[in-house]
Amino acid sequence: MKKIAAVESFFSPEHRAAIEKAAAECGFAVDYFTQGHLPADQAADYEIIYGMCPPQELKAAANLKWLCCSFAGVDAYTDETIYPNPDVLLSNSSGAYGITISEHILMVTLMMLRQMPKFEEIVKNREWEKGLSMRSICGSSITVLGTGDIGTNFARRAKALGAKVIRGVRRTKKAGDPAYDEMYTFEELDSVLPKTEILVMALPATKETNHILSRERIALLPEDAYVVNVGRGSAIDQEALMEALNGGHLAGAALDVCVPEPLPKDHPLWDTKNLLLTPHISGNMSLGITRDLDVELFCEDLRNYAAGRRLKRLVDRKIGY
């Protein structure tokens, strides 16, 4: 019988039951392994790998036909040379992380707008200072750079909170979700940034997105603008961002991703002014709804795979998503 290697540690009994039900329907058996490790002497047994398998372990999977990553960002898996053959299908779990990451974006955005980091210091010093100015998402001008599942989930939440205008920016100009008031392409980004109060970045790591927020584009943002990045650290000229924050040329930034990761203890990013820094945890798999969706999406595409249909979350390795 054909076999699936499920290489993850979060599977509950209910998750396993769902995976095994879908697998049985499709003529597969399932074996489970700890997240991040598929034994080399067993790897060749599997036609499908689902979960988190390090790129360097894939060569041993001589009969691999489909790798389904249990996460959204697959930049480490787009190089054809890591696979036993160039025809291996690659898919991700886009659609599982929109809720949890959009909530993170909303949280850090409100923290910055409401001056929470400064109020935290005030309270730690046992002071009763109420004079800091605060702002609101309501009535604000927001640009979402990257209008996939994550960016769009945030746009919907921002719209519900009364954002004045939400602009979506993406690689190609297609009709966007109703949450977006205006849609633009990457080539039109320069015209959008000067009108942006809150810039949210939710982009994959590709050649096209590398330093898309360049030094020149950071300078186009208003001095009272905020930047939030939950995609990949490579999308921002990090040195230029630090200079802008330290020089007071931006109101603040929240980064859940950076370069490099993990960040060395002596890196200047730690000490950058008006910066909220988190260690790439916005999409943490601890939320039950994220885990449930991840398994649900895999089972859906497993049925597509078995029926010879196109995978819904198939990744184009040439463009990176």
Which residues are covered by each model-predicted region?
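Glycine-rich NAD(P)-binding loop of Rossmann-like domains
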Residues: 89, 119-153, 182
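Rossmann-like adenosine-cofactor binding region
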Residues: 172-268
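C-terminal helix-to-coil terminal segments
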Residues: 89-104, 118, 261-321
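Phosphate-coordination loops involved in phosphoryl transfer and adenosine-cofactor binding
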Residues: 1, 138-141, 224
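Short acidic low-complexity segments
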Residues: 33-42, 55-59, 179-195
